[in-house]
Amino acid sequence: MPCVWITGASSGIGAACACRYAAQGARLVLTSSSQERLEGVAAQCRAQGAAEVVVLLFDFRDLSGIDALARRAWEAFGGLDIVFLNAGVSQRTTVEDTSLEMVREMMEINYFAPVAIAKALLAPMVARGGGHIAVTTSIAGRFGFPLRCGYSSSKFALYGFFETLQAEYYDRGIRVTLVCPGRVRTNISFYALDKGGQRHGKMDPGQGGGMSPEDAARIIVHAISRSRREVLVGRKELLMVYIKRFFPGLCARLARRIRPV
């Protein structure tokens, strides 16, 4: 059974994927900044059949210890088969109301953290014969989305880095899956950064009516097992990805009409 490390594992997509891998008998390393919620997910995974579960707490707003975190995750079971870099934070502010500090925080958590982990694990993965890195991007990383300027920027950046990584390391046994969710019913909007850096504190209507995390996890875990380069996760909102590709002008007009909160 695979050894799997999931960041952002205390709720939503990360927790649902952890439970799905647990049902396969996987060995799991789970990371989040919330000890209580993470321990709850770990207990659920053990009950659902995980061979072993290790919990590693980490706050991705401070990356000074991230190399040590990656080393601990790797050493937990003597190597990792799958790394799912899922931790992230969103926002609900206009460009004018988004401070540079807020943008930097989102870039640290959403972009630099997964980049740093991937870089730390590349050499041991290659030496071991390969491995699989999945990373959560977003539909907001495929086109500009109102009230998401910093969030969209961080997710656009993930595409550039991880597509490059795949091109460079494919022949050395590294596989990359870009996980692109649309509206999934998680707490991402509740914990999103609002004006002044405070929590948004409520579920967006679109988010609340989105796909369940369990359905999303089923799609994601299957895509990783098939080494899919990219997997779109959601419902009709994913049409915007294809509209952007084939009708960019129409996509821009539709984006201006989106009311995300």
PLM feature segments, named:
Residues 48-63:
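Rossmann-fold cofactor-recognition segment
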Residues 10-11:
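Conserved glycine-rich cofactor-binding loop
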Residues 94-95, 99-104:
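Substrate-binding pocket helix/loop in short-chain dehydrogenase/reductase
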Residues 118, 154:
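Active-site helix of classical SDR
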Residues 138:
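Residue(s) in the substrate-gating loop at a strand-loop-helix junction
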Residues 24-41:
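Conserved glycine-rich Rossmann-like NAD(P)H-binding loop of the short-chain dehydrogenase/reductase
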Residues 171-235:
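SDR active-site lid
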